[in-house]
């Protein structure tokens, strides 16, 4: 029997909570009220594959990136005590989808937010060749204008023949986006290292009504000459987009400021 997919929620001063997937139909029926993200003027978002915190200097870089950042979308985030302390001290809630444990702390996507989500749907897809899982997380947050912002944090499958499994991982995300009427941010490490994968990703984004954030000076990490990390959006305006060059991971973090 396959393992049930769930998220772990980390909140300062509270026990770790296990969250099971929410159904997309909940998005149509209305979500509970909650405190909005502090986004009166700008919404600052950081997206970073943190490489399981294996390189020196990751924590100082993370702390600097976290300044005035309302949403931080991490991939390959391993729930070490250092990361959990940072997350709970700096953010209202941190939700992680454990993809697998190495060796004792789960690793997967983690979304850190300056407000508690009113909806949470963890997703996982197994790598067909390595039999390891990649994870994604859908969360929804109120923003100051009364709308609900959907945030999708993804680490896409890497090793597969063709794009069938790649597209299969995107399909349930598309269902979630289609059920949501407000603004959306879809971001993460898409492992889009082939022309087939980029085509599949672009078609998916187009079908979902999403635009791609463009970087004027593009220092995104690449494989076979193609960028791996992307940010897509709808219902928001991009004010600034940049990439920080760092040796603290094998990926460079993306930083975007939106106007809600």
From Swiss-Prot:
Record keywords: Cytoplasm
Record carries keyword Cytoplasm: yes
Classification via HAMAP family: UPF0294
Protein name, per record: UPF0294 protein YPO1077/y3099/YP_2772
GO cellular component, one term: cytoplasm
Family, as annotated: Belongs to the UPF0294 family.
GO MF annotations in UniProt: catalytic activity
Pfam families the UniProt entry points to: Exo_endo_phos (PF03372)
């Amino acid at each position: 029997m396959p393992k049930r997919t769930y998220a772990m929620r980390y909140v300062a001063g509270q026990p770790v909570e296990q969250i099971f997937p929410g159904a997309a139909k909940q998005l149509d029926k209305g979500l509970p009220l909650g405190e909005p993200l502090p986004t009166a003027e700008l919404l600052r978002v950081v997206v970073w594959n943190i490489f399981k915190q294996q390189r020196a200097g990751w924590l100082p870089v993370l702390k600097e990136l976290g300044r005035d950042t309302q949403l931080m979308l991490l991939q390959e985030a391993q729930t070490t005590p250092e990361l959990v302390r940072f997350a709970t001290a700096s953010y209202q809630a941190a939700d992680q989808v454990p993809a697998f444990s190495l060796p004792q702390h789960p690793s997967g996507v983690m979304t850190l937010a300056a407000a508690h989500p009113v909806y949470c749907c963890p997703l996982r897809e197994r790598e067909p060749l390595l039999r390891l899982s990649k994870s994604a997380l859908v969360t929804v947050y109120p923003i100051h204008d009364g709308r609900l912002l959907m945030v999708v944090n993804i680490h896409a499958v890497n090793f597969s023949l063709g794009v069938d499994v790649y597209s299969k991982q995107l399909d349930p995300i598309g269902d979630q986006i289609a059920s949501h009427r407000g603004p959306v941010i879809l971001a993460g490490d898409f492992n889009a290292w082939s022309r087939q994968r980029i085509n599949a990703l672009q078609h998916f984004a187009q079908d979902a009504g999403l635009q791609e954030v463009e970087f004027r000076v593009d220092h995104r990490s690449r494989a076979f000459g193609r960028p791996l990390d992307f940010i897509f959006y709808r219902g928001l305006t991009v004010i600034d987009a940049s990439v920080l060059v760092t040796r603290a991971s094998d990926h460079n973090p993306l930083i975007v400021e939106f106007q809600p």
